[in-house]
């Protein structure tokens, strides 16, 4: 299985500043020119919400302050400017190889 290592495990960012979350895959998640890495946001008591798919594509209805980048094994989620409602746990997920796997999560606190 592909192992996804997220960092940091938690971070605290001031309102209006930038949050950066990294995800490193144990092997490439690229196929035929696309990177099969997705990012989810989860708040307590709610199911995960898809933010970014295929590394850099913003899901419909998600604010443009969320952005994703990367390819191969190294990926990044940026949130800028951070808003209070962004406090949540964020997960990367690869969908290149079955079983699809998730990172261990990054908890974002807004200061």
UniProtKB/Swiss-Prot annotation:
Example GO biological process: adaptive immune response
Region (Framework-1), start-end ranges: 1-23
Region (Complementarity-determining-1): 24-38
Region annotation (Complementarity-determining-2) ranges: 54-60
Region described as Framework-2: 39-53
Claim: Ribosomal protein is one of the keywords in the record: no
Domain of life, source organism: Eukaryota
Region spans: Framework-4: 102-111
Name of the protein: Ig kappa chain V-III region PC 7043
Gene source species: Mus musculus (Mouse)
